[in-house]
Amino acid sequence: MGRDTIADILTSIRNADMDKKGTVRIASTNMAESVVKILLREGFIENVRKHRENNKYFLVSTLRHRRNRKGTYRNILKRISRPGLRIYSNYQRIPRILGGMGIVILSTSRGIMTDREARLEGIGGEVLCYIW
């Protein structure tokens, strides 16, 4: 059985958020780097750096904190398409999360991108996850 790297990323971020940790360590793969890059660009995480340990690479992500409190922002991360049930969407039927406040991460023929980028380019793909 294969591993679901997207679910591992989302679960580790969710667990670190619930445990009030400031950083998350994620195994580095091409898919993980693309998803974390989108999360960084959209402002769901503050900082990312690549760390090497015993010839293995890890992405160390810093979660975004509130200015006046010590806790992190509560992000809801939901896996949609999974290995047992793939969900695809064309660009006209890509769902809008909270009226555009959240993002949908898609795997397209041109790489991993957000719902806004996919609509602008007019391409659909596999709906990986929702984040709001």
Swiss-Prot record:
GO biological process annotation, one example: translation
Pfam families: Ribosomal_S8
Record carries keyword Zinc: no
Domain of life: Eukaryota
MF term (GO), any: rRNA binding
Principal location: plastid
Keyword Protein biosynthesis: no
Keywords on record: Chloroplast, Plastid, Ribonucleoprotein, Ribosomal protein, RNA-binding, rRNA-binding
Family matches, as PROSITE patterns: RIBOSOMAL_S8
Any GO CC annotation of this UniProt entry: chloroplast
Localization (cell): Plastid, Chloroplast
Subunit text: Part of the 30S ribosomal subunit.
Main function: One of the primary rRNA binding proteins, it binds directly to 16S rRNA central domain where it helps coordinate assembly of the platform of the 30S subunit.
Family membership: Belongs to the universal ribosomal protein uS8 family.
HAMAP family: Ribosomal_uS8_B
Official protein name in the record: Small ribosomal subunit protein uS8c
Organism: Liriodendron tulipifera
Lineage: Eukaryota, Viridiplantae, Streptophyta, Embryophyta, Tracheophyta
